[in-house]
């Protein structure tokens, strides 16, 4: 099972990725983890990436693709892999295709943006304990206070509505076009293209997982 998981920030990709990886016995690969591992291992590509990052520059798509090819050749990828948050752009997708990276599925978790904004901007946390709440879906007993200590809850910077909207805009501009890229490739070249599947990402975690498994068996 070789797949790409697509979806906006806050669509619940992380939860579903963990379940899919466990179910199929495959590793979850993100470019961040991959870069850190290559740098730590001191591989030639890792050293190249480190030099670029130390200079405060972005790692090129070519280097990322070479790291991807190196990573998926490792023994734990024998049964497949799940790419989370990669590719992010059309040039990266083109580079993957040109490099001959074979994929079985592209699975999109589709959640309306207003639902994501409500989901993320409603989160509150108690930093000292790590307890989390949601103003609508899992509210504290007393508004704005931790259930156990009564201390004030905070909203993380990442969860502020303005920040969420900015991240969704970046997703719309850069990554959302991949949905059209993979769905049209699947229609025009079904023999070589990965199967493109989209599922609704609203409802309970169990419902979404069931939709994902059904999509990946069709």
From Swiss-Prot:
The cross-references to CDD domains, in alphabetical order and at most eight, read: ADK
Q: Where does AMP bind?
A: 31, 36, 57-59, 85-88, 92, 156, 167
Instruction: State where the protein is found.
Output: Cytoplasm
Residues annotated as region LID? 122-159
Chief location:
cytoplasm
Pathways involved: Purine metabolism; AMP biosynthesis via salvage pathway; AMP from ADP: step 1/1
Q: Which UniProt keywords apply?
A: ATP-binding, Cytoplasm, Kinase, Nucleotide biosynthesis, Nucleotide-binding, Transferase
GO CC terms, sorted: cytoplasm
User: Could you tell me the EC number(s) of this protein?
Assistant: 2.7.4.3
| Stretch list, region NMP | 30-59
Q: Which InterPro entries match?
A: Adenyl_kin_sub (IPR006259), Adenylat/UMP-CMP_kin (IPR000850), Adenylat_kinase_CS (IPR033690), Adenylate_kinase_lid-dom (IPR007862), P-loop_NTPase (IPR027417)
Q: What's the entry's take on its domains?
A: Consists of three domains, a large central CORE domain and two small peripheral domains, NMPbind and LID, which undergo movements during catalysis. The LID domain closes over the site of phosphoryl transfer upon ATP binding. Assembling and dissambling the active center during each catalytic cycle provides an effective means to prevent ATP hydrolysis.
**Protein name per the record:** Adenylate kinase
